[in-house]
Amino acid sequence: MTLTASSSSRAVTNSPVVVALDYHNRDDALSFVDKIDPRDCRLKVGKEMFTLFGPQFVRELQQRGFDIFLDLKFHDIPNTAAHAVAAAADLGVWMVNVHASGGARMMTAAREALVPFGKDAPLLIAVTVLTSMEASDLADLGVTLSPADYAERLAALTQKCGLDGVVCSAQEAVRFKQVFGQEFKLVTPGIRPQGSDAGDQRRIMTPEQALAAGVDYMAIGRPVTQSVDPAQTLKAINASLQRSA
């Protein structure tokens, strides 16, 4: 077990904002990152960027002071998922996720793989229902539950397996906090500041609404990454959240 970056080497942020990076060019991504302050947000690296640029890109972001949510949504047989989660922990990321639909044995194996990392283990989060999915999409998969009901079923399984929380839509957050308690972390994509384009998300909410709903961490992408002044945009979002708290 070799941690590449300890939390003590990175900036401390109390912001719930996680900026979702979405770049095809590594230099463009780093150019954007160099415009913002790690005290104002964390960063999310997904499948495309990790496939293009690899673990070294994550290390470069960490060296700039950022906590990293490695959003790879592992979904495999238990042993493979466990090894993947342990590899993410070795990389020193702040958060990593798996698909709850992988089942209880897979999620339990992933959680157990993090035990050797102790306090340096990343948060382990499960994905419930992707925010782009509607009831008709679930019906195509043979799921007759609504997105909200199916997400709650998967969230209950996630908590039973001892994970730290779930990725869910902001609309589900109020219910989830009531059912699963304050310590069960809720991570929400589809967050758009007032006036932003909805993009490819179907179930969206503003940062202020998300905070009021009980969201712990909110992923915000293009409204920040495509801003002419991303640092100021982040500061404005954080200021509005502080006023709403």
UniProtKB/Swiss-Prot annotation:
Pfam (any one) = OMPdecase
Q: Which domain of life is it from?
A: Bacteria
User: What is the main EC category here?
Assistant: lyase
* GO MF assignments: orotidine-5'-phosphate decarboxylase activity
Q: Does the keyword Lyase apply?
A: yes
Q: Which PROSITE patterns match?
A: OMPDECASE
The catalysed reaction is: orotidine 5'-phosphate + H(+) = UMP + CO2
Q: Quick one: a GO biological-process term for this protein?
A: 'de novo' pyrimidine nucleobase biosynthetic process
The pathway this protein participates in, as annotated, is: Pyrimidine metabolism; UMP biosynthesis via de novo pathway; UMP from orotate: step 2/2
Can you name a GO cellular component term?
Answer: cytosol
Q: Which residues form the active site?
A: 73
- Binding of substrate occurs at 22, 44, 71-80, 131, 192, 201, 221-222
EC assignment: the record states 4.1.1.23
Keyword terms of this UniProt record? Decarboxylase, Lyase, Pyrimidine biosynthesis
SMART domains the record matches: OMPdecase
InterPro entries per record = Aldolase_TIM, OMPdecase, OMPdecase_AS, OMPdecase_bac, OMPdeCOase_dom, RibuloseP-bd_barrel
What does the UniProt record say this protein does? Catalyzes the decarboxylation of orotidine 5'-monophosphate (OMP) to uridine 5'-monophosphate (UMP).
| Listed PANTHER family | OROTIDINE 5'-PHOSPHATE DECARBOXYLASE (PTHR32119:SF2)
Which family does the entry's similarity section mention? Belongs to the OMP decarboxylase family. Type 1 subfamily.
- What HAMAP family has UniProt attached to this entry? OMPdecase_type1_B
**Subunit structure as annotated in this protein's UniProt entry:** Homodimer.
Query: In its UniProt entry, what is this protein called?
Result: Orotidine 5'-phosphate decarboxylase
